[in-house]
Amino acid sequence: STTSDAFNVSSLGSGADGTPGYPLISVWLTGKELKDAFEVDASVTALMPEAQIYGAGMTWTWNPHRMMFNKVTDCAQVLPDGSAVPIDDDRLYRVVTGLYTGQMLGTVNDQSFGILAITPKDAQGNVITDYEEHIIYNPNGSEVKEWYALASYLQSMGEVDGRYAAPEGRKVEHATWNPLNLLKNLNLFGWLAVLAAVLVLAA
């Protein structure tokens, strides 16, 4: 891989400095909001395959047969040693992502009609209103671009680690019609839909 290859992967947009490439930003989400982000990924991927979330340090499993915004059945935080721990709904987790992706996460509330809620915050839990204030900078004051972060990571390895030759299992599709799986970990919207279906069948 060359620097130009890495640039082509993440070459869109520009930051506050006007130079090519979206910069990385640092924001904080609650565990509940992370789970909602996974739901967005699982529900939207089938409709827009190009619009996917890939998260380092997290894993989630979804069932495509479940209802919209209720497709994720399991999720966890993956620690550096490879072990998985449950995600705490109330804890704040640091998320580093591109400026564009961060801005799009903030639109989920409206796009999901309030079913899902993702509100990026600062480390103290205050709602972010200007994402450019949370851009990550190099020691020399320049923005850390998405493409540059990727190029630097590839360069640090010398030869690309063989584990990248195949998916790491961070996003797992588990298609099943098993009733227990279809009802597992439903959110409020899911249970209301189930209740409505039961009432219709009982009428």
What are these regions (language model features)?
Residues 1-203:
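Catalytic centers of hydrolytic enzymes
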